[in-house]
Amino acid sequence: ATFDKSSFPIVKVVFEEGPNSDEEFDNFTNEWLELYNQKIKFTFLFDTINMRNPAYKYTIKMSQFIKRLKREEIQYLEKSIILINTNKIKYMLDFIFLIQKPVAPVYIYNINNGPTSSIYEIMAHSETTSISP
């Protein structure tokens, strides 16, 4: 995953296929923890559009990571916006949040209708799922 902090406090995270290894997953969670170490509130914008075939084992690892995050005294993540375009990713997210509720509100936007020009267009014209902590 690539973390783009140029619009901080909005942090865009773009996934290209993976994670495909434990090392990639660990890099992802370490970047997330670095944001917490800054002790500044932020919002994630996850772009999973290019994610094709992530391994199911990372759903369990992600739920364990969320559980670990919940032990933090202060939650710096204010909300997550997740862009998806496949049912597989949606099912994996549903499974993660069934096992472990999120640390902050999550908004999932299914953008099956192709690329859009802005996040505002996505939010206005996409099917949305909301998950509360």
Where are the regions that the model predicts?
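Amphipathic, Lys/Arg-enriched alpha-helical "gate/interface" segment within cytosolic domains
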Residues: A1-P133
